[in-house]
UniProtKB/Swiss-Prot annotation:
GO MF annotation, one: D-mannose binding
Keyword field: Disulfide bond, Early protein, Glycoprotein, Host endoplasmic reticulum, Host membrane, Host-virus interaction, Inhibition of host adaptive immune response by virus, Inhibition of host tapasin by virus, Lectin, Mannose-binding, Membrane, Signal, Transmembrane, Transmembrane helix, Viral immunoevasion
Transmembrane segments: 132-152
Signal sequence annotation: 1-19
Natural source organism: Human adenovirus B serotype 11 (strain Slobiski)
InterPro entries per record: Adenovirus_Gp19K, Adenovirus_Gp19K_sf
Keyword Transmembrane belongs to the record: yes
Protein role: Binds and retains class I heavy chains in the endoplasmic reticulum during the early period of virus infection, thereby impairing their transport to the cell surface. Also delays the expression of class I alleles that it cannot affect by direct retention. Binds transporters associated with antigen processing (TAP) and acts as a tapasin inhibitor, preventing class I/TAP association. In consequence, infected cells are masked for immune recognition by cytotoxic T-lymphocytes.
Similarity comment: family membership: Belongs to the adenoviridae E19 family.
Membrane topology (Cytoplasmic): 153-166
Name listed for the protein in its UniProt record: Early E3 18.5 kDa glycoprotein
Di-lysine motif (motif): residue ranges: 162-166
Post-translational modification: Both disulfide bonds are absolutely critical for the interaction with MHC antigens. N-glycosylated; high-mannose.
Domain notes: The lumenal domain binds directly to the peptide-binding domain of class I molecules. The di-lysine motif confers endoplasmic reticulum localization for type I membrane proteins.
Amino acid sequence: MGPILVLLVLLSLLEPGSANYDPCLDFDPENCTLTFAPDTSRICGVLIKCGWECRSVEITHNNKTWNNTLSTTWEPGVPEWYTVSVRGPDGSIRISNNTFIFSEMCDLAMFMSKQYSLWPPSKDNIVTFSIAYCLCACLLTALLCVCIHLLVTTRIKNANNKEKMP
């Protein structure tokens, strides 16, 4: 029994057949991250990153196409969607049209940065710019948590009132 366990452990560590594993098979085209790419020459820079483990990912936004990472700009009038396409090993293409609230994200960051003379970011104010951005994100998260808490407590209170009614 002991040698069989050792053999199973070694086989699970070596994972035979894992060299043929294709990470593009499990890649979710909707699982991308969007962050700002601050640059002095851009109104609002956005950095879209998708799937470093899969080389056949193409991101398209505003008539620009790039593999895995796309640095683009957003301004009013530019579409708020981007397309992610993944080419499978059999040649088939999976396409996902993702929408994102570029306008709200850019408006909030630009307002906060201009309010405190943080735009355009430079070596002198990048720390302050980052702190202001994080504080905005924390404020929005706290507001969301308070709203969810109020919703839950109101539903519990309403459920208790319904039980007491004859």
